[in-house]
A protein has these predicted regions:
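Bacterial N-terminal signal peptides that target proteins for export
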Residues: 1-8
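A structural "domain/chain start" motif
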Residues: 3, 18-70, 150
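Bacterial N-terminal signal peptides
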Residues: 10-19
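Repeat-unit-sized solenoid/scaffold elements
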Residues: 28, 78-82, 142-150
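Surface-exposed short loop/turn segments
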Residues: 66-67, 77-128, 132
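Conserved beta-strand termini and adjacent loop/short-helix elements that scaffold enzyme active sites
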Residues: 72-76
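C-terminal partner/receptor-binding element of secreted or periplasmic proteins
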Residues: 121-150
């Protein structure tokens, strides 16, 4: 009887540990810090996007505009920061179900630069992410940049 209790207790503990790991997944995208951000003012809160497709540019512009960033799709020389897609690969595949749906997976890495001194601030390396996953990583990097705003 004691053996059965120990086996059941072991199974219960295994179930408890696996369910806890499902309840608390990782906290989101991992953005690598490269160098410190020089302080900037609200009037300098501007960024341009380079190396992204038109659809990705529009999505980033929409998200950052909601966070009160001035966003440009080309370098005019007035921007304080730059979001540069050093590499961006898009894989498309179709769901062969009743309603045909096309999915896109993004792989690559994007850097956030300070255009005032040319320093790379953050790097986000992503593999097989949806567009929302890529945007979440960029937003996380830009929120880290915002912490240096005076």
């Amino acid at each position: 009887m004691k053996i059965i209790k120990k086996v059941l207790l072991g199974m219960f503990m295994l179930l408890a540990f696996t369910s806890c790991s499902l309840l608390f997944p990782d906290s989101g995208p991992s953005v690598t810090h490269v160098s410190s951000v020089s302080p900037f003012t609200k009037s300098q809160k501007s960024v341009y996007i380079e190396g992204a497709t038109v659809g990705v540019e529009k999505a980033i512009k929409s998200r950052l505009t909601q966070r009160n960033w001035r966003v440009s799709t080309e370098d005019t020389g007035n921007e304080t920061f730059a979001i540069v897609f050093d590499q961006l690969n898009i894989d498309s595949y179709e769901d062969g179900g009743f309603i045909n749906t096309t999915y896109h997976e993004f792989t690559g890495y994007v850097s956030i630069f300070d255009t005032r001194n040319g320093e790379r601030l953050y790097v986000y390396d992503f593999t097989k992410q949806s567009l929302d996953g890529v945007l979440a990583g960029i937003e996380k990097g830009m929120s880290e940049v915002e912490k240096s705003m005076r």
